[in-house]
Amino acid sequence: MNLSHKTMFMTLYIVFLLIFGSYNATARIGPIKLSETEIVQTRSRQEIIGGFTFKGRVFHSFSKRVLVPPSGPSMRHNSVVNNLKH
């Protein structure tokens, strides 16, 4: 391998690491849930929400809104587990 191939592969490797690292960082933040009143107020003031909005959630990495809490076991799941005989 000559020097230009090594340089090209190192550049691609670094770019791959940067892209993969930034994807993991943004994926951990997760979607942001907006209430319908916030969406209506934002539209009425003609402000732009930064990011892609889908069913009341905004998908972007730098958020100023309330994060959606992670989902846990449901009450139905808890009742089934609690009723099991040990």
From Swiss-Prot:
**Keyword flag Disulfide bond:** no
Entry keyword annotation includes Secreted? yes
Q: Note the SS bond partners.
A: none
**One biological process term in Gene Ontology:** floral organ abscission
Q: Tell where it localizes.
A: Secreted, Extracellular space
Look up the coiled coil feature and give its residue ranges. none
Major location, coarse class?
Answer: secreted
Any further remark recorded for this protein: IDL1 is redundant with IDA.
Described function: Involved in an ethylene-independent separation step of floral abscission. May act with RLK5 and HSL2 as ligand-receptor pairs.
Quote the protein name from its UniProt record: Protein IDA-LIKE 1
Q: Which organism is it from?
A: Arabidopsis thaliana (Mouse-ear cress)
Species lineage, top-down?
Answer: Eukaryota, Viridiplantae, Streptophyta, Embryophyta, Tracheophyta
